[in-house]
Every structure is written in C-alpha cells, then in structure tokens.
C-alpha cells in the first residue's frame, strides 16, 4: 500500500536535494534529515510492548519498546545515504545490506552482495533506497528477503513514480507498505525519474 508522507519540512528539504546547484554535502545532509523525518512518521503505524526499567531514583517504571526487532536494509549503494538519518532516531535498529548493480542496457538489477542480521523472521524489515524508478531492484530485494522467510517487509524511498509502485504491487499486492516522500511524474527514456533527483548515488558520494 502506497503512503506519500506529506510534511512541509520534507517538501522543503526535498527541494534542496532536487536543486542542481546543491553539492554533495548539501544533498547528503538533506537526505539524512528527510530520513529522520520519514521514520518518525512511518513508525506511527508500528506496535510497542511494555518494558520494565528502574529509574535513577530506584523506582520501577513500566515503559515501552518496539514489540519486534527493527532492521533497515539499504540497497547498495545509494540506500546507504539514508541510513544515518534513520538510525539517528532508532539507534538500536540493526542494519543489513543488499548489493544491486543495474545493467544500463536492460535496466535489470543483478545482486552482488547479501547480508542480513540474525533476527526473528517476523522482525520489522525496511528496505531502503532513495529512488523507486522501475521498481526492479526493490522487487528483487523483497523477493530475496521473502525467500529467507521474512514476511513483515516495508519499502522506504524518497522519490518514486507510478511505474515503480505498480511493479512492486504487481508482485506483492498490498502486502508491502511503500513509503515515499514524493510521487514524481514519470521515467525518461533512460529510466531516470523526472523531475527526480538525478543519480542519487553519485550525488550522495560526489562521484560521476
């Protein structure tokens, strides 16, 4: 199910990222900040359980913690750019990695790395990638995680298009929550999002 997070701060920071005059440091800073804002909104939907602690004046207190492990799984390499912002609010979360490279002719992804923490199969898994373009990388990543037995998976992206959303929903129906900061207009002939952000990986790391 698609959820576009409509928040003024997200819109302003996303404008900074879209600006071609923004260098990699500005791009990266705004990406991290949007990640924190997104995870704050996303986790409204998730359950907590009670946790007993002892306060600094030696009193018992019944507080809260998430009822399941939280795991962020960035799709390399661009997904790494969002991780610091996500972990800022949930430092106890674990992080897995899925490496995908895109064939520039067929636009199909190929997996080259996969490592996920040892956590219960019902953990909250968030696949992270700034861009949801064709959706092929997201579909392959989610399929791989499901093959490993994980069934509580969500997709967190900054910018997406209908084609990518439809591709994910074609494979998984509404079982997957898709969280976007913005739903953009279309893909161009090179399968880049318009108006988009450009190549997110290059803009995060200052490469070309």
UniProtKB/Swiss-Prot annotation:
It catalyses: UMP + diphosphate = 5-phospho-alpha-D-ribose 1-diphosphate + uracil. SUPFAM superfamilies: PRTase-like (SSF53271). Allosterically activated by GTP. Its EC number is 2.4.2.9. GO terms for molecular function: GTP binding; magnesium ion binding; uracil phosphoribosyltransferase activity. InterPro entries: PRibTrfase_dom, PRTase-like, Upp_B, UPRTase/APRTase, Ura_phspho_trans. It is an enzyme of class 2 (transferase). Uracil binds at residues 193, 198-200. Gene3D superfamilies: 3.40.50.2020. Binds 1 Mg(2+) ion per subunit. The magnesium is bound as Mg-PRPP. GO terms for biological process: UMP salvage; uracil salvage. Its cofactor is Mg(2+). NCBIfam families: PRK00129.1 (NF001097), upp (TIGR01091). Catalyzes the conversion of uracil and 5-phospho-alpha-D-ribose 1-diphosphate (PRPP) to UMP and diphosphate. This is Uracil phosphoribosyltransferase. It comes from Mycoplasmopsis agalactiae (strain NCTC 10123 / CIP 59.7 / PG2) (Mycoplasma agalactiae).
């Amino acid at each position: 199910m698609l959820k576009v997070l409509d928040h003024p701060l997200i819109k302003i920071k996303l404008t900074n990222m879209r600006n071609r005059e923004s260098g990699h440091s500005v791009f990266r800073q705004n990406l991290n900040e949007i990640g924190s804002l997104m995870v704050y909104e996303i986790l409204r939907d998730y359950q907590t359980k009670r946790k007993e602690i002892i306060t600094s004046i030696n009193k018992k207190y019944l507080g809260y913690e998430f009822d399941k492990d939280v795991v962020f799984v960035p799709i390399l390499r661009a997904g790494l750019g969002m991780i610091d912002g996500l972990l800022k609010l949930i430092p106890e979360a674990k992080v897995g990695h899925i490496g995908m490279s895109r064939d520039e002719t067929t636009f199909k992804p190929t997996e080259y790395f996969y490592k996920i923490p040892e956590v219960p199969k019902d953990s909250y898994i968030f696949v992270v990638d700034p861009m949801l373009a064709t959706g092929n990388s997201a579909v392959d990543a989610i399929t791989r995680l499901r093959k490993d037995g994980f069934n509580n998976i969500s997709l967190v992206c900054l910018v997406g298009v209908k084609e990518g959303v439809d591709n994910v929903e074609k494979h998984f129906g509404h079982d997957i929550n898709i969280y976007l900061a913005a739903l953009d207009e279309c893909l161009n002939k090179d399968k880049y999002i318009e108006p988009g952000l450009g190549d997110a990986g290059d803009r995060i790391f200052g490469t070309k």
